[in-house]
Regions:
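Active-site acidic/histidine proton-transfer and metal-coordination neighborhood
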Residues: 76-158
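N-terminal pre-domain/capping segments
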Residues: 1-69, 73-92
């Protein structure tokens, strides 16, 4: 089944009188959409109660939920501390997507920065292995540019 829906709430969502993300599922279902991406782009900041309510609404209206992990994930960073933070962001996103009733995390695995594309790619592959050892029970949906990176990440579902 193909899932289709927005990332976050659009201007038309608010123009229709909605105020909270919990209302998105009914609104989307009425529009014939069946997916919703909750964004943690600037941080993982949803409490357990809100996640519980959103999960109930998602299930009630048959709208599948995913999350977008923080934008500052970068498995091509040369700092071990920053790699550990990237792993932590994905791990915490996995915990939250499960609380929300979903099973997919969308994230951008790396950026080139001041390296060559080849250097960034090799570093990303090496550091991404740290994430794979966690055995997360979610599906990783990488937002990637470039064929080489795409071919590499297409083989991973965790």
């Amino acid at each position: 089944m193909i899932l289709f829906g927005p990332s976050g709430n659009s201007n038309s969502f608010y123009a229709d009188g909605n105020k909270k993300s919990e209302q998105a599922f009914e609104w989307l279902a009425k529009k014939g959409l069946n997916a919703y991406e909750y964004s943690f782009g600037r941080g993982i900041n949803i409490g357990e109660e809100k996640a519980r309510v959103m999960r109930a609404e998602s299930e009630k209206y048959g709208v599948k939920i995913s999350v977008h992990a923080p934008y500052y994930i970068n498995f091509s960073n040369q700092s071990d501390d920053m790699i550990e933070k990237s792993v932590s962001y994905v791990l915490n996103s996995a915990i939250k997507v499960r609380q929300l009733g979903g099973d997919r995390i969308v994230f951008h695995p790396a950026s080139v920065g001041k390296m060559t594309r080849e250097q960034a790619f090799e570093l990303c592959k090496k550091n991404f292995d740290k994430l794979l050892t966690l055995g997360l029970a979610v599906i990783n949906c990488n937002c990637i540019l470039g064929e080489k990176l795409k071919r590499y990440f297409l083989k991973f579902h965790f």
